[in-house]
């Protein structure tokens, strides 16, 4: 195998999906620890000590302990190159997370074993199922009193409609948690408390019978019965079914104590797929093609406090990036030279000399790159992506200093280009209406406007409950519609016509009266 093909085969690009507080940030830290990317893992709880989760680098994230922005972390493990896309963990940040799932080849689902399958996990799994993304599952928090593990497997199968294949099995739970039993290698790994910040060589005992004294006779007898039950009732691991997105290998442990994470990572790097082919409008692009192709799935403003720049997160789909190369920007039809692409470590940026399929690199962006843009080495090719989603909550922006209107508009357009929030300019007023998927996003925007653009603003209620993008191929009918409904119409930050409805009934009536107008809840980038 050539060096080029070896580099592609090494890549594992994935994201973690979970409900808030299921332990995603903690497990991210432990992975970075195993990959020698950080020296000690800072638990999210230790906010007062100034130890912050490495992936939570924006100021508000540090204060609240939540992962608002998607950062990208690359590190080596087991002879693989891991590209971990950190996804926003808090409930409010779903749209960014959805888009991130377009840039991965597999996903790790973290389930809080105390609570079971939760709402956010269901929504994220639905996005993964659209592309049949292979899923590995980690049942977390077994150092607490959790739900019954068999119940948890049933719940995953029934709610998420995916078969479960347990790879190991927990021995007890909470204060009686003794470790895990490897169902495929007949090996017990014994749990000890107090090793969450380090890589610790937990004791292993080969052969279940040899672990009887270490785990105690009562737990041993329970475990024997459970294992018989599990072997009879659950699915065996099948690699093909996993790669097709129909079956998930399940690992048990506790990320906070760094227990069970290594076993999961070993399994993940062994089974998760290398970079996969990608669908474009014109054709399917194979990962091992020689020419560089890729797409932008996120734009982040001001990752560097010293510079008011923007970084476009670019997923390489094929070919090799080399420093200084020229690429073709499909949307604008222009050539672009990339002299200083970046690789990321959650806010720490390094220039990258080369990149392969599966890698995420950062392109400096001075306003010309948008989410969903495709780049090639000359071919007219547009990758299919996940669109903008209509916001669900709306507020009017109230400016404290009217002289700062220009700075406010610039800041809001930049923030909307990141895809984290959306801004609308109504036809008949000078108002700026902000739309988001969740409430906390408004706090993020206000704080970033203050710290990055020196603009202080507050919010007022606005008589908008729904937004729909307007499309019509008949120019005359579209112009008539604009005149008739100008009180409800606005342009979004990218200049697309949008209908802002005060009520669901209002929207329904407008749709019924205008059958030739398309009212869309999504907009392709």
Swiss-Prot record:
> Which PANTHER family does the record match to this protein?
PEPTIDE CHAIN RELEASE FACTOR RF3
> Could you tell me what this protein is called?
Peptide chain release factor 3
Residue ranges annotated for the tr-type G domain, each copy included: 9-276
Q: Provide any one GO MF term from the record.
A: guanosine tetraphosphate binding
One GO CC term, this protein = cytosol
Give the protein's biological function: Increases the formation of ribosomal termination complexes and stimulates activities of RF-1 and RF-2. It binds guanine nucleotides and has strong preference for UGA stop codons. It may interact directly with the ribosome. The stimulation of RF-1 and RF-2 is significantly reduced by GTP and GDP, but not by GMP.
| Originating species | Francisella tularensis subsp. mediasiatica (strain FSC147)
Show the SUPFAM superfamilies listed in the entry: EF-G C-terminal domain-like (SSF54980), P-loop containing nucleoside triphosphate hydrolases (SSF52540), Translation proteins (SSF50447)
Fetch the PROSITE patterns from UniProt: G_TR_1, G_TR_2
Family, as annotated? Belongs to the TRAFAC class translation factor GTPase superfamily. Classic translation factor GTPase family. PrfC subfamily.
* Pfam families, per database record: EF-G_D2, GTP_EFTU, RF3_C
